[in-house]
Amino acid sequence: KRGESQVITFKIISTDEEYLDEKIFKKVVKYLDEVVNHPLVIDGGFKEEYVAIEKENLKNRIESIINDKGRYAVERAREEMFKNEKYGISDLGYLADIDKITAKGLYEHYVNIMKTSPIDIVVEGNFDEDEIVEIISNGFDFHRENIIEIPRADFIKKVDEIKVIKEEMDITQGKLVMGYRCNVDYKDEFKYYSLFVGSNVLGGGPHSKLFVNVREKESLCYYIYSSLEKYKTSMFISSGIESENYDKTVELIGEQLKSLKEGKISDEELLNSKSAIISSLKTIKDSLGGSSDFYFSQSMGGTNTTVEKIIEMIEKVTVSDIVEAFKNIELDTIYFLSNNKEA
């Protein structure tokens, strides 16, 4: 899921033809086309046995989320924060809906998706571009009609009232999640990457304000970090705390964000954050499929910016740029999962 868009991804990996005695890319595309456009269909639907297996697998995945209390807390915070928005819908769906899925209904839904949804094809590797474009153009048996235009997610929203959600569970460590609306247009790339650097200064690792001041100096949490969601330009701060430290932790997190917004960022904090981000960006091309995932994400955002260009922007970010990017950020939701009824 990217923002408010549910994304279905098919991936196939093959050996570089340079190391083979024959050209295989046409065969690779044909195989992928068979999987995507000609799946096994029986009596107008997917095979019942396969659907039943996948329904159970999905149930298990949904049920397993609760075993990872940190992830569960973030999911619940997101669900509450975006309750009346598409982004609040779980990417895995809900247990109550799974039994309603039929083999025939699922296949009909799949066919409709393949006919009407936008499709991006990304190829990563060592190849002749013109040859690859020709093979792909002729290699897929898509049947397209009435292609829908997916609207851009709303990213600007005024917070009328901060939501505070407290829930209880049999756990040994409380989970605190604070959700913020950044109110920044990600298509304003320099401002977005200024926001990105600022988020890293705030909670991006051992060098960050939250880690140093909340975890190390005050010993209020077991872990703490901040993360951004690009397409909704929202930020979540997540931490594991003792229930009795709830009020103090919320207060201190607020103080660290206030410090950031006031431009109280040292040269060391800024340099460490930039270095961490740039090092991460440079590894994209080192991982199998890293570049294709990156450029698909860029395509979805309508930006199509290279890694090198992003690094240039990161290097140019100043403290005043961060202050400007964080100018309109607002706390929207506080979610606390506790084992203490008095928390």
Regions found by a protein language model. Give the residues of each.
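M16 family metallopeptidases and their MPP-like homologs
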Residues: 1-38, 71-93, 118-124, 178, ...
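Hydrophobic alpha-helical hairpins/lids featuring a short glycine-rich hinge
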Residues: 18-67
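Active/ligand-binding-proximal structured segments within catalytic/core domains
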Residues: 32, 178, 189-202, 214
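Sec-exported extracytoplasmic/periplasmic mature domains
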Residues: 37-41, 63, 111, 115, ...
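Short, low-order "capping/linker" segments at domain edges
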Residues: 59-66, 161-175, 278-288
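An aromatic/glycine/proline-enriched structural segment found at the starts
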Residues: 95-96, 112-116, 120-185, 343
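Phosphate-proximal small/polar/acidic motifs at interfaces that engage nucleotide phosphates
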Residues: 152-156, 193, 211-212
